[in-house]
């Protein structure tokens, strides 16, 4: 692929993201995870903001927020413009999966935001988090027309 990056570049970007997210946050004995799913524009971000106001010790994981950390983001953006997300998707998927895995191992409270395109990913996440001792809430937000 034209926009390949090194593992070292990935690790550097991952460390930056993880440090930003965990700054001033602490693990919990009884952690909670909120999984938010819905169409773009359904209001997931509003619920996320409300949850963060309610609990300041919570980390929000939203894959779209990590696009700009792609080591070649600006090159991809310059070449593909509005089509650039499909070229950054593998990177943000890898970042997101690792963050969920590592931060849940350490028992941080989490908000995991996504579109829930399939039932498989959120169900797998719920099971994994439950096995790690989490209380899990699945919230599906829908737009009514």
Predicted regions and their residues:
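The conserved Walker
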Residues: 39-40
């Amino acid at each position: 692929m034209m926009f390949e990056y090194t593992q070292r570049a990935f690790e550097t970007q991952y460390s930056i993201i993880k440090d930003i997210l965990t700054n001033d946050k602490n693990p919990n004995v009884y952690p909670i995870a909120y999984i938010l799913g819905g169409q773009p524009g359904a209001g997931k971000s509003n619920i996320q903001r409300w949850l963060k106001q309610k609990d300041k010790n919570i980390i929000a994981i939203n894959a779209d927020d990590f696009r700009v950390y792609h080591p070649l983001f600006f090159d991809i953006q310059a070449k593909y413009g509005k089509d650039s997300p499909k070229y950054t998707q593998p990177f943000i998927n890898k970042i997101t999966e690792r963050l969920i895995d590592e931060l849940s191992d350490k028992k941080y409270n989490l908000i995991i935001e996504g579109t829930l395109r399939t039932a498989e990913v959120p169900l797998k996440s719920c099971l994994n988090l439950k096995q790690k001792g989490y209380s899990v809430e699945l919230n599906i937000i829908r737009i009514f027309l």
